[in-house]
């Protein structure tokens, strides 16, 4: 009897972990966008007017729970919880629920950035949250949950990142560290996540996952409800989980401890793709991109060029401030069949703490758009750059087609096919790429979706004529506005 029960439990755990890697995308859609710090009402409108029609699969939204109000309203205040009430600068619970429903109705899934590791850091005196809840973080008193000091690990500072105890039981940058082995803490976290599932979300991005023991997270994940069938999810669907685990390959707490529980953020992807398109590594080496570079297996890796944290750091990571290289890196990211892809949608920043665009009363303002659909009032909206949303369409068009026809010049000019459905070429050299290349596409004329769009049968940018052998003449000048060209079967003139 015991052996049967144990086997049954292990099988259930295995099936749950496998299910938690499924993002529940509609049809052939397969790209997530992080609409960082957007309001819920604006996200709902964006799903209906842009993301759905452009074929985006889902949105990662900023934390939904009540947070501390910090002076100047820096973005990171959202990562300092006061309670699990669904009231933030992005909106209230009613507005959040309306957004989730409207996005699901147009095939765009919602993934919530959730904070299970900690509550707010120290605050002088009584802190007031975005829903008006009072707390005394220094005393570890959060009546809005409620949590008291007994629900937290003892106060200590992380001084040695090679010490597992410190990494997982001390306070990350002073944030009060919850004890996830506590039955009470577990129950409150599960209750919070289950409420979001009831409202129709498809899954969660788990912040600071490496700072929590994997066995505690496994318990929490396995205790969650199935996704809400009223929002179009099949019966017995499990929430998609992707976990923030920063692992550069030499960490005491490894990404491998979490990869079977759900997807894991592959930070090495971000660093190495930045190195390549900054010119620090020849593009020819990208032929073995993915597990050949020591990355996680494709289905366990959440991949990105930059995220809301590392785009603010110096180093190899590319961001919107290097637009030509950034668009090339994003095109490669979305064209190469590796990982679960997420693109960034930022707001402009001058320093690490810059808040999102806000009015004189410190209320987040809605994005505004010019005649081309680009954002103009402090929002960057990379997802609205033609070169990026066109590659979301490219990724949808080629879907599961394999890499074929790799070509390179031994340096920084490369091209490859995605079966007979798509073709990409890149030029990161200081001289032109002018070459007859195998596009692997059926004969015909194709619109380069990077330089233009196919409108009423005509291409507004470059076009390439492919002969009966699949070859076409490819030209990317060293001083072209974009260093990449993309063709696919859904953009045939």
Curated annotation (Swiss-Prot):
Needed co-factor(s): Ca(2+); chloride
Residue list for modification Pyrrolidone carboxylic acid: 20
Annotated disulfide bonds: 47-103, 156-170, 375-381, 417-440, 447-459
Reactions this protein catalyses: Endohydrolysis of (1->4)-alpha-D-glucosidic linkages in polysaccharides containing three or more (1->4)-alpha-linked D-glucose units
Binding-site residues, Ca(2+): 117, 168, 177, 211
Keywords assigned by UniProt, alphabetized: Calcium, Carbohydrate metabolism, Chloride, Disulfide bond, Glycosidase, Hydrolase, Metal-binding, Pyrrolidone carboxylic acid, Secreted, Signal
SMART domains linked to this entry: Aamy, Aamy_C
Chain positions of site Transition state stabilizer: 309
Signal peptide annotation: 1-19
GO-annotated biological processes: carbohydrate metabolic process
Domain of life: Eukaryota
Catalytic machinery residues: 207, 244
Gene3D superfamilies for the chain: Glycosidases (3.20.20.80), Golgi alpha-mannosidase II (2.60.40.1180)
Comment on bound cofactor: Binds 1 Ca(2+) ion per subunit. Binds 1 Cl(-) ion per subunit.
Molecular function per GO: alpha-amylase activity; metal ion binding
EC number(s) given by UniProt: 3.2.1.1
Subunit architecture: Monomer.
Similarity field: Belongs to the glycosyl hydrolase 13 family.
Name recorded for this polypeptide: Alpha-amylase-related protein
Classification of source organism: Eukaryota, Metazoa, Ecdysozoa, Arthropoda, Hexapoda
């Amino acid at each position: 009897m015991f052996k049967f029960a144990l086997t049954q439990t292990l099988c259930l755990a295995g099936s749950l972990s496998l299910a938690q890697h499924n993002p529940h995308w509609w049809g052939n859609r397969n790209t997530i966008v992080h609409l960082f710090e957007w309001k819920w009402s604006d996200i709902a409108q964006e799903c209906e007017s842009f993301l759905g029609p452009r074929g985006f699969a889902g949105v990662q939204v900023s934390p939904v729970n009540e947070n501390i109000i910090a002076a100047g309203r820096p973005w990171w205040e959202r990562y300092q919880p006061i309670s699990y009430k669904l009231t933030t600068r992005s909106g209230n619970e009613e507005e959040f629920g309306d957004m989730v429903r409207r996005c699901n109705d147009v095939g765009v899934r919602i993934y919530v950035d959730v904070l299970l590791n900690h509550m707010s850091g120290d605050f002088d005196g009584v802190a007031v949250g975005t829903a008006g809840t009072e707390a005394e973080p220094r005393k570890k008193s959060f009546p809005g949950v409620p949590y008291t000091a007994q629900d937290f690990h003892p106060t200590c500072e992380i001084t040695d990142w090679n010490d597992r105890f410190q990494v997982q039981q001390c306070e990350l940058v002073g944030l009060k560290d919850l004890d996830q082995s506590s039955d009470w803490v577990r129950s409150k976290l599960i209750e919070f996540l289950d409420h979001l599932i009831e409202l129709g979300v498809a899954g969660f991005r788990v912040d600071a996952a490496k700072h929590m023991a994997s066995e505690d997270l496994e318990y929490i994940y396995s205790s969650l409800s199935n996704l809400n069938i009223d929002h179009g999810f099949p019966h017995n669907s499990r929430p998609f989980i992707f976990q923030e685990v920063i692992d550069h390959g030499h960490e005491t707490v490894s990404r491998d401890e979490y990869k079977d529980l759900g997807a894991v953020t592959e930070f090495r992807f971000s660093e190495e793709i930045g190195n390549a398109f900054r010119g620090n590594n020849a593009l020819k080496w990208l032929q073995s991109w993915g597990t050949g570079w020591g990355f996680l297996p494709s289905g366990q890796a959440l991949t990105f060029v930059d995220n809301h944290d590392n785009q603010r750091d110096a180093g190899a990571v590319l961001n919107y401030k290097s637009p030509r290289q950034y668009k090339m890196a994003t095109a490669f990211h979305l064209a190469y069949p590796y990982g679960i892809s997420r693109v960034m949608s930022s707001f402009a920043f001058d320093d690490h703490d810059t808040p999102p665009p806000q009015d004189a009363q410190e209320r987040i303002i809605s994005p505004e758009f010019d005649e081309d659909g680009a954002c103009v009032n402090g929002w960057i909206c990379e997802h609205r750059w033609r070169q990026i949303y066109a590659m979301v369409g490219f990724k949808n068009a080629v879907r599961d087609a394999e890499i074929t026809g790799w070509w390179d010049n031994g340096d920084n000019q490369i091209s490859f096919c995605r079966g007979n459905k798509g073709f990409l070429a890149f030029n990161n050299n200081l001289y032109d790429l002018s070459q007859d290349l195998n596009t692997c596409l059926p004969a015909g004329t194709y619109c380069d979706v990077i330089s233009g769009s196919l409108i009423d049968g005509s291409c507004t940018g470059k076009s390439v004529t492919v002969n009966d052998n699949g070859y076409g003449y490819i030209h990317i000048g060293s001083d072209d506005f974009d260093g990449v060209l993309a063709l696919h079967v859904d953009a045939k003139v």
